[in-house]
Amino acid sequence: MICYNHQSSEPPTTXTCSEGQ
C-alpha cells in the first residue's frame, strides 16, 4: 500500500492511500 499527500497545501495528516504499487 502506498500513502502520499494528495495536496502539498494540505497537512501531512491528510493523505491518500492506494492499494497497489
UniProtKB/Swiss-Prot annotation:
Transmembrane segments: none
Keywords: Acetylcholine receptor inhibiting toxin, Disulfide bond, Ion channel impairing toxin, Neurotoxin, Postsynaptic neurotoxin, Secreted, Toxin
Region Disordered, annotated ranges: 1-21
Tissue and organ distribution: Expressed by the venom gland.
Chief location bin: secreted
Keyword Disulfide bond included in the entry's annotation: yes
Similarity comment text for this entry: Belongs to the three-finger toxin family. Short-chain subfamily. Type I alpha-neurotoxin sub-subfamily.
Name of the protein in question: Short neurotoxin E1
Species, as recorded: Micrurus pyrrhocryptus
